Amino acid sequence: MKPKLMYQELKVPAEEPASELPMNEIEAWKAAEKKARWVLLVLILAVVGFGALMTQLFLWEYGDLHLFGPNQRPAPCYDPCEAVLVESIPEGLDFPNASTSNPSTSQAWLGLLAGAHSSLDIASFYWTLTNNDTHTQEASAQQGEEVLRQLQTLAPRGVKVRIAVSKPNGPQPQADLQALLQSGAQVRMVDMQKLTHGVLHTKFWVVDQTHFYLGSANMDWRSLTQVKELGVVMYNCSCLARDLTKIFEAYWFLGQAGSSIPSTWPRPYDTRYNQETPMEICLNGTPALAYLASAPPPLCPSGRTPDLKALLNVVDNARSFIYIAVMNYLPIMEFSHPRRFWPAIDDGLRRAAYERGVKVRLLISCWGHSDPSMRAFLLSLAALRDNHTHSDIQVKLFVVPADDAQARIPYARVNHNKYMVTERATYIGTSNWSGSYFTETAGTSLLVTQNGRGGLRSQLEAVFLRDWDSPYSHDLDAAADSVGNACRLL
């Protein structure tokens, strides 16, 4: 039995009624709270933005140091890149007025020189911008002489000029280079014969690491008025220009006394941009993918696509047509002893025509220095054109006409182009198409993929079709006397 308990109510002290705040103080408190939230938000955004900015600056400065995985694409380039095809049309070679036309090589070079502010790097095969080598007073040499005069003004006005040139294997005029040295330019000769048994056949300029020229034209007065040349000038495209400078820096390094090709190139020479991860650029107002390739493979640091691999990739990815304009086409190691067959490009073209039904057109140069053995290989390719196999390969020879005076100019009157265009891609290079140029000789190419009409690709296609349909293009079975004695392949 429970004891009887007396319960008492537990008394809790009554709370005093809270005093109400005046309305103006409440509103002030709410305003202060709102302001604090905004300040915190702004602070957070500032920290995030600063972090993003520092990350971008870090990648911009050190992005080449293998920070990207195999499946990660580098950041796009936001430069307003402008590409302009430039040509040298030999005197006396005339197209109809309505034909495709482009600015001249000399006009483009002089414009680049006039606009140079801080630096000019030139990779070159040889130098003869005056006609001293011919011991004549050839009037058409004036454009080359003017280019040399303007080059001599750069160093005195504070522009750093560096020239990498192939070391000659024999006697070669050096007056141009001596004049440039005296004006303050720096010159290094690259002994490619010792390094790879080849030559430095590259032809490009980089101006202020912002603009560049790349193409077939040598530093030769004939390349401006007596030889048919094609190249591209890229304006306001520092992303690509800086990448091309890396190729130049490799030549510059190899031009030092006693230098050799590194077994592994130091990281500053590496690139992020290649066949697998091309640079995303805005080219002439249109999205495009671009990268630079190099030859021979020992001169390709990490990330750099070899020139031959890049060329074959364009061939293998063509689905409609492949148009090629090149001075020499030889599926051999041209300078090899004993002789060696080299079918890498030839196989790719045959496969494209036979397996995928791609229309293949080759416009090959014919002049007094053409290798006669080229004819048999060209006939072999052309023989694949067959209604039963539906293979469509055509070959034509381009002959630059010459009068008696022009015919006496040595190493002139030839189509020196080195490019390819498909329905998808543009390839503009500095090499002839035979094995040694890709395995031993230094060369560079620009590759661009761009959709739509009016871009670089369609402009190059128009140039090819103009030349292909011109009276200067001849079938392989044309009569030799119909084109004069300049062509050795008929």
Swiss-Prot record:
<feature type="binding site">
    <location>
        <position position="218"/>
    </location>
    <ligand>
        <name>phosphate</name>
    </ligand>
</feature>
<feature type="disulfide bond">
    <location>
        <begin position="366"/>
        <end position="487"/>
    </location>
</feature>
<dbReference type="GO" id="GO:0014902">
    <property type="term" value="P:myotube differentiation"/>
</dbReference>
<keyword id="KW-0333">Golgi apparatus</keyword>
<keyword id="KW-0378">Hydrolase</keyword>
<feature type="binding site">
    <location>
        <position position="201"/>
    </location>
    <ligand>
        <name>phosphate</name>
    </ligand>
</feature>
<comment type="similarity">
    <text>Belongs to the phospholipase D family.</text>
</comment>
<comment type="function">
    <text>5'-&gt;3' exonuclease that hydrolyzes the phosphodiester bond of single-stranded DNA (ssDNA) and RNA molecules to form nucleoside 3'-monophosphates and 5'-end 5'-hydroxy deoxyribonucleotide/ribonucleotide fragments. Partially redundant with PLD4, can cleave all four nucleotides displaying higher efficiency for ssDNA and RNA fragments initiated with uridine and guanosine residues and lower efficiency for cytidine-initiated substrates.</text>
</comment>
<keyword id="KW-0832">Ubl conjugation</keyword>
<keyword id="KW-1133">Transmembrane helix</keyword>
<keyword id="KW-0256">Endoplasmic reticulum</keyword>
<feature type="site" description="Cleavage; by lysosomal cysteine proteases">
    <location>
        <begin position="71"/>
        <end position="72"/>
    </location>
</feature>
<feature type="transmembrane region" description="Helical; Signal-anchor for type II membrane protein">
    <location>
        <begin position="39"/>
        <end position="59"/>
    </location>
</feature>
<dbReference type="GO" id="GO:0006629">
    <property type="term" value="P:lipid metabolic process"/>
</dbReference>
<dbReference type="GO" id="GO:0006954">
    <property type="term" value="P:inflammatory response"/>
</dbReference>
<feature type="disulfide bond">
    <location>
        <begin position="81"/>
        <end position="237"/>
    </location>
</feature>
<feature type="domain" description="PLD phosphodiesterase 1">
    <location>
        <begin position="196"/>
        <end position="223"/>
    </location>
</feature>
<feature type="domain" description="PLD phosphodiesterase 2">
    <location>
        <begin position="411"/>
        <end position="437"/>
    </location>
</feature>
<dbReference type="GO" id="GO:1900015">
    <property type="term" value="P:regulation of cytokine production involved in inflammatory response"/>
</dbReference>
<keyword id="KW-0395">Inflammatory response</keyword>
<keyword id="KW-0677">Repeat</keyword>
<dbReference type="GO" id="GO:0046872">
    <property type="term" value="F:metal ion binding"/>
</dbReference>
<dbReference type="InterPro" id="IPR032803">
    <property type="entry name" value="PLDc_3"/>
</dbReference>
<feature type="binding site">
    <location>
        <position position="438"/>
    </location>
    <ligand>
        <name>Mg(2+)</name>
    </ligand>
</feature>
<keyword id="KW-0479">Metal-binding</keyword>
<feature type="active site">
    <location>
        <position position="201"/>
    </location>
</feature>
<dbReference type="GO" id="GO:0005765">
    <property type="term" value="C:lysosomal membrane"/>
</dbReference>
<feature type="glycosylation site" description="N-linked (GlcNAc...) asparagine">
    <location>
        <position position="387"/>
    </location>
</feature>
<keyword id="KW-0443">Lipid metabolism</keyword>
<feature type="topological domain" description="Lumenal">
    <location>
        <begin position="60"/>
        <end position="490"/>
    </location>
</feature>
<keyword id="KW-0472">Membrane</keyword>
<keyword id="KW-0391">Immunity</keyword>
<dbReference type="GO" id="GO:0031902">
    <property type="term" value="C:late endosome membrane"/>
</dbReference>
<feature type="binding site">
    <location>
        <position position="416"/>
    </location>
    <ligand>
        <name>phosphate</name>
    </ligand>
</feature>
<dbReference type="GO" id="GO:0043202">
    <property type="term" value="C:lysosomal lumen"/>
</dbReference>
<dbReference type="GO" id="GO:0000139">
    <property type="term" value="C:Golgi membrane"/>
</dbReference>
<dbReference type="GO" id="GO:0002376">
    <property type="term" value="P:immune system process"/>
</dbReference>
<feature type="binding site">
    <location>
        <position position="203"/>
    </location>
    <ligand>
        <name>phosphate</name>
    </ligand>
</feature>
<dbReference type="InterPro" id="IPR050874">
    <property type="entry name" value="Diverse_PLD-related"/>
</dbReference>
<comment type="subunit">
    <text>Homodimer. Interacts with APP.</text>
</comment>
<feature type="glycosylation site" description="N-linked (GlcNAc...) asparagine">
    <location>
        <position position="132"/>
    </location>
</feature>
<feature type="glycosylation site" description="N-linked (GlcNAc...) asparagine">
    <location>
        <position position="284"/>
    </location>
</feature>
